């Protein structure tokens, strides 16, 4: 991704097109499949590293996962505050449901795709074959990484005042406020709020409420299997009053 690309994304969503550290944004687009692996790990798995072709990027040292971790927290806080202001008469249960609907990976992955972020995703050939570039869960991670980069980049700004109050009180700069403007503009441009309010597709929550109401118990959830790229693959089993052994899915 280029400086002009980043500036265009920022200005499209109400943020000044000023980039202080382009490398943060470049890092945000590096999937872990395109990073260098430890030599010992390659030897153990009999992986032979070929020379990089002239028309390919060199493998990167670090992926976007630390930025994703940061962006996830920033997005969570911004979304909660946005819902708190948008729905002043709703209770915390309603806001929690809508927050889950907004920030789940598939939802923000859809936003990332509509924004065109997938075009700059740096992934391996194997990941490309597994259609990671259009995998909404992975694009959700990409969105969070970009947001983490934006947050850090605008924290580079120092705010001075005569009494040095900003310097003594705030650990960060205005990165959160800039991220807030960015996310809220995206919500306003891409989210169908009428559909979001009417629909409740949190099927796990619907089932749990019914089970708790009728049987006075809370279900236990068991992870069936997990693929690092594809995510969770879960069979659905309901067990009331007895243990299930030897599950297949």
Where are these regions (language model features)?
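Double-stranded RNA-binding/processing signature
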Residues: 1-249
